[in-house]
Amino acid sequence: ENRKVFLNRTLMKVLFLFFWQAKNKYTMSARILIVEDHADLRHLIRMMLEFDGYEIYEASDASEGLEMVHRVRPHLLVLDIMLPGGMNGLDLCRLLKTNPALGLPAVVLVTARGKPRDIEAGLAAGADAYLVKPFNSMKLLEIVKRLCEKSAH
């Protein structure tokens, strides 16, 4: 009886992994760059997106993010606005959206700045979506999926 339960559980795990991979097959080729200076949040976002099958890259400031854009050509950036160094997230977003040579990736701004004028500034800089911290993780996943599907067509 115990062996039967063990085999059933093993079979369920194998089936889950098979269907999970099939469900996420379209996302496997989507490259996402997370530009966030807080390592814990960057890691959390990475885990969420990797679980959904995305290929993830990370940067801790806008300069490193720009370097990674040149190197990996991401389909989408999850980008904080308030970053250390000379360039902030809005500057990087503007640069990405006005320079077709960089591939015109989709940009999701994820920031603590939630005033209407901040949101307007983010969208004016070219962001495709704007989320205020603390954000709903399911909402981020929905936005990322929608934007990745849109860029695939």
Regions inferred by a protein language model and the residue ranges of each:
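Active-site beta3 strand of CheY-like receiver
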Residues: 72-78, 83
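Conserved acidic carboxylate
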Residues: 36
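Acidic catalytic/metal-coordinating carboxylates
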Residues: 61-64, 87-91
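Alpha4 helix (beta4-alpha4-beta5 surface) of REC/receiver domains from two-component response regulators
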Residues: 43-46, 91, 114-131, 138, ...
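Two-component/phosphorelay signaling modules centered on CheY-like receiver
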Residues: 39-57
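Short amphipathic alpha-helix used as the core "switch/output" element in two-component signaling
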Residues: 67, 90-103
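Short hydrophobic/Thr-rich beta-strand motif most characteristic of the beta2 strand and flanking loop
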Residues: 53-62, 68
